[in-house]
């Protein structure tokens, strides 16, 4: 009798066992993150207009190549905001005591901050906020890719008028001898940024 009861309660085969485990995993995730099963908040008309305008500004004014000599007014404003998080990244990751991580931390933090904000909006099921954070996140791919490409040409001005010895990506490419991959790496990051922006819209 005990065996019959066990056979009725246990999944009868491997396929059912897998399905059983997947359902349990899904239940555990829902229990840990109950907000993820909530419906998305609707996008208000002002938010929709703002996001559409922001997307169009990206299309018109954001760089179409990794080689630029300066920023437009719009991209300059965005870049200056990103620059705050970039410089903060050097300080933050510098606490780990690793020189390479401290150098890389500037560009890394540019991506981490909008990604964390994206996770927050996503967790709260805020559709407009999620779209905004993703556009900011992928826009930083473009910003970082331009800085990467400039590691070879050194035409962009550095903060505080620092010389080329302070160029993050010049130092990183030197350190890992990646000069033959500069163009491929920077263009890959650049196009990932643009694809992400289009998919966000």
Model feature map: region roles:
Residues 1-9:
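Cys/His-rich metal-coordination motifs, chiefly Zn-binding "fingers/knuckles"
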Residues 7, 84, 178-182:
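A generic structural micro-environment signature
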Residues 20-21, 26, 30-67, 98-201:
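Metalloprotease/metallohydrolase-associated module, dominated by Zn2+-dependent proteases
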Residues 62-83, 99:
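Short pre-active-site segment immediately N-terminal to the catalytic Zn-binding motif
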